[in-house]
Amino acid sequence: MSIWVKIKNMDNRDGAVVSVKVFDTQGQQGETVELNTQEEVEKLVHGSNKIVVEEVRQP
């Protein structure tokens, strides 16, 4: 499964909250994020302490 992440409100300060949206290439609406998916997002958005996933879209 391939996904890409749109990052909103990126802030590298300690304790910053990062909002991300995950889309498939067709922009289809997805389901609520699962723990393993959020861990993948955290790896993509490295260097951030907190991540808020607004939407998850998967193919």
What are these regions (language model features)?
Residues 24-50:
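Intrinsically disordered, low-complexity Pro/Gly/Ser/Thr-rich segments with frequent PxxP/GP/PP motifs
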Residues 1-32:
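N-terminal acidic leader/helix
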Residues 49-58:
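A short, solvent-exposed beta-strand micro-motif common in secreted/extracellular proteins
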Residues 17-19, 40, 44, 55:
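Detector for intrinsically disordered, low-structure N-terminal pre-sequences
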Residues 1, 58-59:
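Short intrinsically disordered terminal tails
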